[in-house]
Structures are given as C-alpha cells and as structure tokens.
Amino acid sequence: MPIIALPDGNKKKFDQPVTIMEVAESLGPGLAKAAIAGRVNGVLLDTCIPIEKDSEVNIITAKDQDGIETIRHSFAHLIGHAVKQLYPEAKMAIGPVIEDGFYYDIAYDHPFTPKDLEAIEARMKELVKLDYDVNVEIVSKEEARKEFEKRCEPYKIEIVDEIPENEIIKLYRHQEYTDMCRGPHVPNTRHLRTFKLMKVSGAYWRGDSNKTMLQRIYGTAWGSSKELKAYLKRLEEAEKRDHRRIAKQMSLFHTQEEAPGMIFWHAKGWAIYQVLEQYIRETLSLHDYQEIRTPQVVDRSLWEKSGHWEKFKDDMFTTTSENREYAIKPMNCPCHVQIFNQGLKSYRDLPIRLAEFGSCLRNEPSGSLHGLMRVRNFVQDDAHIFCTELQVQEEVSKFIDLVFEVYRSFGFDSVLIKLSTRPEKRVGSDEIWDKSEKALSDALDAKGLAWDLLPGEGAFYGPKIEFSLKDCLGRVWQCGTIQVDFSMPERLGASYVAEDSQRRTPVMLHRAILGSFERFIGILIEHYAGRLPIWLAPVQVVVMGITDRNAQACQDICKKLSALEYRTEVDLRNEKIGFKVREHTLQRVPFLIIIGDKEQQSGEVAVRTREGKDFGSMPLKGFTSLLDEAIALKGRSGVS
C-alpha cells in the first residue's frame, strides 16, 4: 500500500490506492478545498488520479504557479463550454495556455464582435457560479474519435487521428460539454473566479496560411482579483509604451504593406541604430573580436551542406540566376565557417572570434509580424568563436562578462539565465556532451550566478545558455545566447592543426548579445517609454530662441555643440517658447537650451530637462560638462 512523502518531509501511509484529493483531505479540509492538482514524483496530475505505489506528492493550489497554469487551462475549456451554449454551430479547435493567460481557436461563420465577447464572458461567469464538478475520463483513441464524431467536431477528430495508438487520451466533461486535453484541470469550477476575456483575433488552423482562418479568443486568469487588477494595469502601461506608437510620435521608423516585416528607418531612428552599432563595434574590438562581412545571397549548395536547407528552406527567400538557385541568408554561421576555412589554422591561432552585423531575411508568417519585435529583415550582432574543447569554458566565461557589461550599459540589471542540455535526438558522443555541459555550468557557477536548468532543451548539435532581460514592467525578453556546436564545423570542413600535428575539428560557439538590433531597439523604446538614456537619444539637445533677435545666437550654439559631436537641433520657428518647450518635451529630447536677450548678452545658456528640471543659466562649457557626465552614465541612471 502506498506511502506518500510530503514536501515537509512527513510521510503518510494508506491502506489502499489513494487519489491526490484524498491525500489533501487527509491533511485537512482547508487544503482539500484549495487543491487544484498535484505533482506525483514530479509529474503534474489531476486530483482524481489514483496513486498506487510509494510516491512523493505535492498538493497544488492557486498560490502555486502550477496552480495558475491549471486554472488558465481550465478557463480555456470554459470558453468552449460557453461558446457551444451560445453558438451551437461553432466548431472548437485548440485552447492552450500562453504567458499570462489562455486562448481558444474557434471556427464560426460570423465574426465575434465586442458584444459577443461580453456575452461569452457573462456566460462563463454564470457557469462558474454553478460550482459543477469537472469530470475526467480516460478513453481509447477509437472512443475519443467516436465522441467527437458524435459532436461533429472536425478539428478534434483531426487531432485524435494524429495521436499514437497506445497514447492515453483524457476527456474533460463540463456538464454537457466535452473537450480533450492532457490536463490537468481544476476539479470544480469554484476554482475559476478571477478572469477576463481580452480580445478576438484571426489565426490560421495549425498556423498554416493555406488552411482555415479561425477566430482566436484570448483571456487572462489569476489567483486573485488583486493580481488581475495589477496585470490589467501593466497592460495599460504597456499600451502607452508600445514602441510602434512612440516611434510614430518621435518619427523613428515605419512599416508598410509593400515591404511586410521590413523597417523604414527615419533619420532619428537610424541615429539610435548607429549609436547602438558603434557601441557594440567598439566593445567587441576591446574583447579581441575581428569584424567581418559576408555575402547576402549564397548558393543553395552551402545551405544543403550546413543542414539549413533541409530544416529551414520554407523560411528562406530564394532566387535563381543563370540556372543556379540561391538563398538570401537567414543566418550568418555557414558564411563565417567559410572565412575560418581560408588558410591553414594552428591550435596557436585559436580562439578565433569572428563578428558580423549580419543582415538576415526569414520568411516569417505575415500574421506574426509586429513592429520591430518580429520582422523578416533583421540585423544580428552575430559572432562565432572557433576554439578547442579545452577553451570552451574560458570563452563562455569571457562571454558572460561581456553580456553583463553590455546589459548594464543599457540599464538592465535583472538578467535571467537558462542552461539547456542534450535532447534525445543529437549528434556527438555522450563524452563530448558531458564536457560541454560541464563547461557551461562551471562557467556560470564560477561567476556565482543563479540559473535554471532546462533538461533536453538544447539544440541537436550542442548545449546552450540563454540570457533574458526583465524590463520595467516585469516582462522577460530573451536576447543573448551562447550555443556550443559540434556539427556545423565538421559538416563544412573546418579544421586546425592540433599540438600533435593532427587535423582536428574546432568547436564553434554561436553567440549574440542583443539578438537583433531591431528587436533590441524595440525593447529599449518600451522599457524607457521613449525617454532613452542620453547617450542613445536620437536628439540630445534642442536649442531654441525666445524671439527672432536670438536666432543667430541659437545657430552659433548649435554649431558649437554639433562640432563637439553632440546630436543637436535648433528650433527657430516663430512660436511661443512655452509651445516649443512642450513639443520637444513630448519628443523626449533630454536637454533643452533656451536663449533670450539675457543669455545672448551674457554668453550663457538656460538649461532644462525633459523631466522639467530647471538648471537656470550657465556657461556653455558648464553645460557640456553636465552633458558629458550624463552620457558617461549610459543606462546606469535607470528608467526616468
């Protein structure tokens, strides 16, 4: 009979198989009432699942992240229940959990309107009040197919048909509504209290533009009303910080239908880009990287050798010329190997660090494109390090230092780190995987860094470390990565002469800090709400006069500041000074210089900031010292 080990170290013995709910009941009525699911030997299960052997059990409630995920998954099914009651002809597709919420894809002849969304949410609340039990039934593939044939649910039937014969299928019954899922789900709708339906959008079935366009209903759910309110507040703030909205206000960039997923950089946006690029260029030079440049268009044969053609050809833009097929590069790595392969390399030459601001194109689905955050044409701060196995840990350690140096310069101090290890399908021996994974984990541990392990999440060709930034709204953005690669150097014939005079294949480390320039600029704009640190601001100073008499003095000051390489503009419009100050403040210009008769006579400048701080009058040299001090801080002064 099972002995149940609890998280606090206590053990309970039962005379017969016991469910998770029965374990919770044995610990107290309060826990039983709050129980949503359970982890049995690390596996998340429904509360009704029997435990037949000795196990470690953790009861999951709404206070746990697993509990929130279970609640959100159950809410997706509740959408299905409500929609089928209100719109019986609707056909249900899939309803997964996503970050901060859930959605359900539905086929229905008529577009759901905002009023429909309100009606669905109202019906969901009515169903929640019924406090009905959610029943689980384990069925065969044949039984599941018959169930959904009876209910005329073609999308469910398609999913069932793709499930392996011996795999367990679970049906979840919400009164008259039945859905299919791996689970777990809440045992009763009393756990489904705090939620809100957010929006409706279009989504192709299976993400394939050749298939049916479905309607996707998004929702969010939380463990308490306080958490829901806080989330909605964050959404409201995120809406204000939307980089597309701010870019329009500041004239940074635009996109248009004639070039989907391609960025039209305006002068001010391009100024930000150039500052970013120059900073990364100078930083990489200090860390002994060689900057290179490789072709945009490369013959198909190279992509076949590298393995990209087989895996990514549908995402590549191709063209033909003189009976040859070419691809616009979706990534830079195969081309970097070509540069490494030029000339004989010795172990004494390693490590070799090749960096490129590589422009890539990927044929992303049009529906996924989103401003700077998801584009088709992007530039990576890409680099590849060719080294020996023994050099991997040292190179990873140096890269970690570089990553944190760069992120601090942009004002990001909260960095989350994940180490992804070997998947089931992989190349390379277990011995080399052991060495590589140990090199990565030892490099992280030597820095005293906290990191999460993601078993089985590495690429087939090697383990990797991912670096994610947390912005001022608590959102997490995966940016940096360093990836060990055993495969590509060998596939593309890279070699060096080792100390024993034998030819060896180098290890290749793929690494990026920003990810892509476009996306990183989008992150910066939203993190700072457009009020970029002074060193990044597209215009650092605007000089403006109070009257026409001050025009020449304004122009002289602008020329002096521009000669010192400060990004400066002059505003000589015949407008009131208050109007001009307000306009440039809304444009997020860090420093405003005002010249009136008094300043013109004294040779000083009146200075104020976009935050409204008034420094009064000072000599121009005093102002440039102030400016230099602010620029030197980079992003370390924080979010204003």
UniProtKB/Swiss-Prot annotation:
| Gene Ontology terms for molecular function | ATP binding; metal ion binding; threonine-tRNA ligase activity; tRNA binding
| Stored Pfam families | HGTP_anticodon, TGS, tRNA-synt_2b, tRNA_SAD
Where it sits in the cell: the answer is:
Cytoplasm
Q: What is its EC number?
A: 6.1.1.3
Task: Report residue spans for region: Catalytic.
Answer: 242-533
The note on the cofactor says:
Binds 1 zinc ion per subunit.
The chemistry this enzyme catalyses reads: tRNA(Thr) + L-threonine + ATP = L-threonyl-tRNA(Thr) + AMP + diphosphate + H(+)
Residue ranges occupied by any TGS domain in the UniProt entry? 1-61
InterPro entries per the UniProt record, alphabetical: aa-tRNA-synt_IIb, aa-tRNA-synth_II, aa-tRNA-synth_II/BPL/LPL, Anticodon-bd, Anticodon-bd_dom_sf, Beta-grasp_dom_sf, TGS, TGS-like
CC per GO annotation: cytosol
The protein's assembly and partners: Homodimer.
Q: What is this protein called?
A: Threonine--tRNA ligase
Species the sequence originates in: Prochlorococcus marinus (strain MIT 9313)
